[in-house]
């Protein structure tokens, strides 16, 4: 698997940060994974990306981990989107952060300025589910096909995704797509 960004923006009050980290680490363990951690502990935001294989059972684990993380963030009176914004991944969690009154106001404003719903569909208002497979770059059943090249690149020790051409340097936690 690879680190997947979907809960990396949660923020909790500093008094609860250590407990949140411990509990979230336990959540990862229950789902057979771990996370990569970095960022701004001084303001209660530790960016974390659970390592998931989105080609297999990653979407189900993503949903379960996100729900548990959201419950903890609510318990600690934190924010599911502390810094980076909401987008497709976190928009479904906006409602409980702002409450029904502001959520309705967001919808009214969106409808006034974008009555056809053409700009940023599924973001902030009338959100799609974060695990909607139709929104994934590659569907869960995506398969790659080996490409035979005319040259031997094995000495370079990199992995190339035949679908995207993206190269993953060895030792960075990547795996072939």
Task: Describe each model-derived feature in a short phrase.
Residues 3-33, 54-82, 86-176:
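Phosphate/diphosphate-binding loops
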Residues 34-54, 89-90:
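Histidine-centered divalent-metal-coordination microenvironment in nucleic-acid enzymes
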